[in-house]
Amino acid sequence: MDDYTREMMDLKTLVTRTLEKKGVLAKIRAELRASVFEAIEEEDRVIENNEGPPPALLGSCNDRARKLHASPSGRLLSALICEYLDWAQLNHTLIVYQPESNLPKDSWKSELRDFNSNNGFELNRNGDSGPLLLDVLEGFLKFESMTQGMGSSSRRDSETESSSSLESRNPPRRSSASDSLPPQRRPVSASQASDRRAGLSTSGYRKDEFNWRQGNQDTHEEVTRASAALENLQLDRKTRNLTSSWRNVRDGTNEEEGRD
């Protein structure tokens, strides 16, 4: 290979890469395919006018797609796709898509006019707005989000109602551990505690009479009366002890005087 051929190949590679980076080559390819499809369509129309057979040259989609395109939902889907291609100015792709899908040329415009008139969409909108396919997709996603939110809230409400009904049927019960705990006592002073310990040995008072609960005014009054009774009892015992000891001392003195 001589130098001239090598330079031409390098130049061809450089031009091809530059065109691919700028998107020019892809546009040329799409335009070429669109031109080929247009030429074939024109030939099909000539044959149809002369002989009358239906054009079926570019029916390359499968049977499921043909059935879908024949249904109202399928026609709307194809119209939304064509409207997006037109919005994105992918004209060559649109030229290829319609005949390859067995769709009449510009049939999507009439389909969208019917859809817009039935649903209140604006067909002639500004270029800044998105395609109708985007609006349909956003509406579907918003509807799904609202449905899920309503479903979760209804589940929470049902769970709350079931839990409240269970609580109403089964009121809370005290645990066995709390039942085994001793009753709470009100704090008392040191003198009252000593008097209480001293009075435990008496026969007139028992331990159960000193179970106090906090916040009960009647119990506090009972504690006061019991403390006063204990003090009186202790005073009586001390008085009797002093009297008996004084009598013993007196009797001993009398005996000594009698001996003398």
UniProtKB/Swiss-Prot annotation:
Q: What are its GO biological-process terms? A: cortical cytoskeleton organization; microtubule cytoskeleton organization; preprophase band assembly
Q: Where in the cell is it found?
A: Cytoplasm; Cytoplasm, Cytoskeleton
Locate the compositionally biased regions of type Basic and acidic residues. 248-260
Effects seen without this gene? Extreme defects in morphogenesis, positioning of mitotic division planes and cellular organization due to dysfunction of the cortical cytoskeleton and absence of the preprophase band of microtubules. In the ton1 insertional mutant, the two highly similar genes in tandem, TON1A and TON1B are simultaneously disrupted.
Where exactly are the transmembrane stretches of this chain? none
Region Disordered, as annotated, extends over 147-224, 236-260
Q: What residue stretches are annotated with the LisH domain?
A: 73-105
Any one GO cellular component localisation term in the record: cortical cytoskeleton
Give the source's domain of life in one word: Eukaryota
Recorded hits in PROSITE patterns, A to Z, give:
LISH
Biased-composition ranges, Low complexity, are 161-175
Which keywords accompany this UniProt record?
A: Cytoplasm, Cytoskeleton
- Pfam (any one): LisH_2
Q: What is its main location?
A: cytoplasm
Q: How does it assemble?
A: Interacts with CEN1, LNG1/TRM2 and LNG2/TRM1 (via C-terminus).
The record describes the protein's role as: Involved in the control of the dynamic organization of the cortical cytoskeleton. May play a role in the organization of microtubule arrays at the centrosome through interaction with centrin 1 (CEN1).
Protein name per Swiss-Prot or TrEMBL? Protein TONNEAU 1a
Q: Which organism is it from?
A: Arabidopsis thaliana (Mouse-ear cress)
